């Protein structure tokens, strides 16, 4: 397994390495940090919108107005939500690589030592990875059924809506320690 992990890391490193000028270059560090923050704001902002605004207020919306949300607003918001998640994880991994801490952070400093900064950024990266997985492989497939984007009977729609909501709530709870870990890594160490 370790050989596969090392091989995978080498493949990722080789695929994004566009020359030695890319790694540790302040310009690219800034560009990818900026893109990471912008895409993260999009992703987590929509996550919090769904959990703190849309879901709690759906019972207050008259039935004749609910299709406006389920057929127009929710699918558009979910597009930005899932692609915000994708952009966040991709830019975060690139940022970890060009700053030289990707391997140490992703192994939580267990392989090759590391600093508290790399440990905390690694915790944040793993929480973000779990959240990204939930978005793409649990929330989105279930939302497609719940919103009628793909065919499903009423029982499956209801079960899918509940599953998507529970995993969305899980991501909301994970977002707090994820953000804390990211901020502490950048500001205390």
Predicted regions and their residues:
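Juxtamembrane inter-helical linkers in multi-pass membrane proteins
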Residues: 57-68, 146-158
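Interfacial and helix-entry/exit segments of alpha-helical transmembrane bundles
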Residues: 65-91, 156-177
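Membrane-interface helix-loop-helix modules in multi-pass inner-membrane proteins
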Residues: 50, 54, 59-61, 75-139
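Functional transmembrane alpha-helices
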Residues: 27-53
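Juxtamembrane boundary at the C-terminal end of a transmembrane helix
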Residues: 15-18, 181-189
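Single conserved hydrophobic/aromatic residue that forms the stacking wall/gate
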Residues: 1-7, 11-12
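Membrane-interface interhelical loops and short amphipathic "cap" helices
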Residues: 18-34, 101-118, 189
């Amino acid at each position: 397994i370790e050989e596969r992990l090392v091989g995978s890391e080498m493949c990722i490193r080789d695929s994004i390495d566009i020359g030695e000028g890319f790694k540790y270059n302040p310009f690219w560090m800034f560009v990818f940090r900026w893109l990471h923050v912008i895409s993260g704001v999009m992703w987590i902002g929509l996550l919090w919108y769904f959990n703190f605004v849309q879901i709690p207020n759906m019972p207050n919306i008259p039935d004749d107005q609910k299709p406006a949300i389920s057929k127009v607003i929710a699918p558009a918001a979910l597009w930005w939500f899932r692609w915000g998640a994708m952009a966040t994880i991709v830019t975060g991994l690139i940022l970890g690589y060009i700053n030289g801490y990707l391997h140490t952070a992703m192994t939580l400093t267990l392989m090759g030592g590391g600093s508290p900064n790399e440990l905390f950024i690694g915790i944040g990266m793993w929480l973000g990875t779990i959240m990204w997985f939930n978005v793409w492989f649990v929330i989105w497939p279930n939302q497609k059924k719940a919103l009628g984007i793909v065919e499903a009977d009423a029982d499956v729609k209801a079960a899918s809506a509940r599953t998507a909501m529970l995993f969305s709530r899980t991501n909301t709870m994970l977002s707090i320690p994820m953000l804390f870990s990211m901020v502490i890594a950048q500001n205390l160490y």
